[in-house]
């Protein structure tokens, strides 16, 4: 075998090995939707109570990880940007999201695509934690998308840890995520379902978040 050909084959073998190692690593670190649990936190502002037959107000909102505002030109919508132009813009968007949630003051708020942990596309901003602390409401949060590194496009999306959050003006006693079938019968990546019971005595109440794209 000629030396140039041998070098080319070695380089190709190394590249194939690196790609295989990357795929194995991504598979090993991806979110296991069957074992994901919802995290419940309690806030001082969740003091409401509901009786059977009461009407409740609901806000459902895909916040787009606070990175898809008017300044963004997202590549999956035909644009050129992978993430918002700057961390300051994501902070501004989060300010607006928190302000709107507080202003509308719904009994139950269902948020989709809110970062559970620091992610590359949102410049490491802890969005779920901001929502908890700044609203002071009881919350239930579960991840539905986690990847240590999304290798596309160029530049790559990078680390993502995103989820679905429910905020309640009434105290949350418990919550659980429920996996449902998605489009074409494929499993969804853990649409969140919050299960709530009033503290103390009384009939149980349930607030379930719809799957992404649902109503």
Where are these regions (language model features)?
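Catalytic domains that recognize anionic headgroups
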Residues: 108, 214-215
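Conserved beta strand-loop-helix elements of the APE1-like EEP
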Residues: 133-136, 159-175, 204-206
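Intrinsic low-complexity, intrinsically disordered segments enriched in polar/basic residues
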Residues: 2-3, 199, 213
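A broad, low-specificity signal marking well-ordered, structured residues that form hydrophobic/aromatic
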Residues: 56, 165, 201
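Structural signal for conserved beta-strand scaffold positions within catalytic alpha/beta enzyme cores
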Residues: 60, 141, 174-179, 214
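N-terminal, active-site-proximal structural segment of metallo-dependent hydrolase catalytic domains
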Residues: 3-133, 137, 141-152, 156-161, ...
